[in-house]
Amino acid sequence: MKKKYNETIICFNIITIFPEMFYAITNYGIIGQAIKKKIININFFNPRNFSKNKYKSVDDRPYGGGPGMLMSFEPLYLAIQQAKSTSKNVTVIYLSPQGKELKQNHIEELLVKKKKIVFICGRYEGIDQRIIDNQVDEEWSIGSYILTGGELAAMVMIDAISRLIPGVIKTKKSIEEDSFTNDLLDYPNYTRPKIIKNMSVPQVLLSGNHNEIRLWRLKQSLGTTWIKRPDLIKKKY
């Protein structure tokens, strides 16, 4: 008997001037299916809808000069207030290169502690500092590089958090054996055929001996991690 999910487990409210960018995850794949099942809920709040000038602009020149434009305080503030008003105990997250760099253990902590998240997706040269100082609870970065906006970073976080929610991914074991779950990279995986272009699947995987397979996979994970991400080994041991 299939389990039914009668209430949303987590809600994401997204502040963005480009909500259409999110159709890639809301309409397709595992996240799209989770939305249809009502396991997760995603809403959008466009700052342009809160702009009070006839051009619906949401940016302005920075005080003190400098290149580019900043997202203005008022449209962002009003969008955040509406996003927060939809539920209680909301956490407001700003996606920024200045934020704490996101790791798998942070994703797990966010899922446990935060059930209602507002993501602020910046654009241009960033947002008015007063929003960060007075409206943002946490700043997160997905890596030490610059994107044109926070939308892709928000999608990364939504995907990473959502896939840990019961019912989003059918096979629990797939999550338990993912890369980084135990601070190790994944082991090599193979599918049919057994031999292609003179390349064979390792014999141990065809043996049916589950203990030997488990040991082989552990050795491969350790070896791959040591070669490609030795920092993970040093952190753990």
Curated annotation (Swiss-Prot):
Its main location: cytoplasm. CDD domains: TrmD-like. Its EC number is 2.1.1.228. It is found in: Cytoplasm. The keyword rRNA-binding does not apply. Coiled coil: none annotated. Pfam families: tRNA_m1G_MT. It catalyses: guanosine(37) in tRNA + S-adenosyl-L-methionine = N(1)-methylguanosine(37) in tRNA + S-adenosyl-L-homocysteine + H(+). Keywords: Cytoplasm, Methyltransferase, S-adenosyl-L-methionine, Transferase, tRNA processing. GO terms for biological process: tRNA N1-guanine methylation. GO terms for molecular function: tRNA (guanine(37)-N1)-methyltransferase activity. S-adenosyl-L-methionine binds at G122, I142, G143, S144, Y145, I146, L147. Gene3D superfamilies: 3.40.1280.10, tRNA(m1g37)methyltransferase, domain 2. It is an enzyme of class 2 (transferase). One of its GO terms (cellular component) is cytosol. InterPro entries: Alpha/beta_knot_MTases (IPR029028), tRNA_m1G_MeTrfase_C_sf (IPR023148), tRNA_m1G_MeTrfase_TrmD (IPR002649), tRNA_m1G_MTases_N (IPR029026), tRNA_MeTrfase_TRMD/TRM10 (IPR016009). Disulfide bonds: none annotated. It comes from the Bacteria. PANTHER family: TRNA (GUANINE-N(1)-)-METHYLTRANSFERASE. Specifically methylates guanosine-37 in various tRNAs. Belongs to the RNA methyltransferase TrmD family. Homodimer. This is tRNA (guanine-N(1)-)-methyltransferase. The lineage of its organism: Bacteria, Pseudomonadati, Pseudomonadota, Gammaproteobacteria, Enterobacterales. The gene is trmD.
